[in-house]
């Protein structure tokens, strides 16, 4: 029915009860915030002296900017590698060749089950023992390896689910046109699957950015680690963490906004140009009028 709803509209008593619950929740929230503010103010964490260091260029140059640079570098490289690895593994799991499908399935399930931190630590010590990278890049390589392997496995499942969600008629039509499985996957299925699953991919890319902070365990210079060092150096842990939180929220919001814009652009490009409007049909009377009104 056009006017149906999923639940009954609340009556007068239900509206009053909902209003009371909302008011009590708001009051309790304000009280909790006031208690937190009072405790921080009593400890002197909200004084102007605690925030003044963030107005100096030396603090940003020494602590914050190197952390931002490390976080963005690790996230950018990991995102590119994870997308490539995830797409390859996702397509492999859909392969008609059984050994390829089994190997890709084992790889995906294995790296999905491992914690990111364990993979970072393992890669860090492996690279250190084998002298794979210079010592100054060991932590970065370990972070990128852990983020790439874990998120690549997750993205593989996203790609596989996106392809499986498409109508079977897509593949059948491609087969009728004589396209091979690889051509069908590359030209028809993957573009549609990635576009339809783009919101989920965006969420996973934000996870990549946030998980880069785990790298502080292997001495990776990232923004959260640098924030704690600011707190230790200036004795302003709370202001430092607040600033770092604002920076991370801003970067994540920018990434989400960019991905949303890209999604809209991709959807608009798939629609193609607007259809041309047909001219008004010429009637027999029009010909007659043009020839003096008679035929």
What are these regions (language model features)?
Residues 1-295:
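Transmembrane alpha-helices and adjacent helix-loop boundaries
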């Amino acid at each position: 029915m056009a006017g149906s709803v999923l639940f009954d509209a609340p009556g007068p008593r239900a509206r009053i009860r909902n209003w009371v619950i909302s008011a009590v929740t708001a009051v309790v929230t304000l009280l909790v915030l006031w208690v937190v503010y009072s405790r921080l103010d009593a400890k002197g964490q909200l004084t102007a002296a605690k925030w003044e260091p963030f107005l100096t260029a030396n603090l940003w140059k020494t602590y914050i900017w190197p952390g931002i640079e490390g976080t963005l570098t690790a996230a950018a490289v990991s995102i590119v590698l994870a997308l490539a690895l995830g797409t390859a593994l996702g397509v492999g799991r859909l392969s008609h060749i059984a050994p390829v499908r089994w190997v890709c399935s084992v790889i995906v399930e294995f790296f999905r089950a491992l914690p990111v931190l364990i993979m970072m630590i393992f890669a860090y010590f492996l690279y250190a023992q084998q002298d794979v990278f210079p010592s100054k890049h060991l932590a970065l390589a370990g972070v990128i390896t852990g983020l790439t392997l874990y998120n690549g496995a997750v993205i593989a499942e996203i790609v596989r689910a996106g392809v499986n969600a498409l109508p079977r008629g897509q593949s059948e039509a491609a087969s009728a046109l004589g396209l091979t499985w690889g051509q069908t996957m590359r030209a028809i299925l993957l573009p549609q699957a990635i576009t339809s699953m783009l919101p989920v991919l965006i969420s996973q890319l934000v996870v990549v950015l946030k998980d880069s902070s785990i790298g502080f365990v292997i001495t990776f210079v990232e923004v959260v680690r640098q924030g704690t060092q600011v707190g230790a150096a200036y004795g302003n842990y709370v202001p430092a963490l607040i600033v770092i939180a604002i920076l991370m929220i801003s970067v994540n919001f920018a990434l989400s906004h960019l991905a949303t814009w890209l999604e809209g652009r991709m959807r608009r490009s798939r629609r193609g140009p607007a259809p041309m409007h047909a001219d008004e049909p010429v009637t027999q009377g029009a010909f007659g009028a043009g020839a003096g009104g008679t035929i």
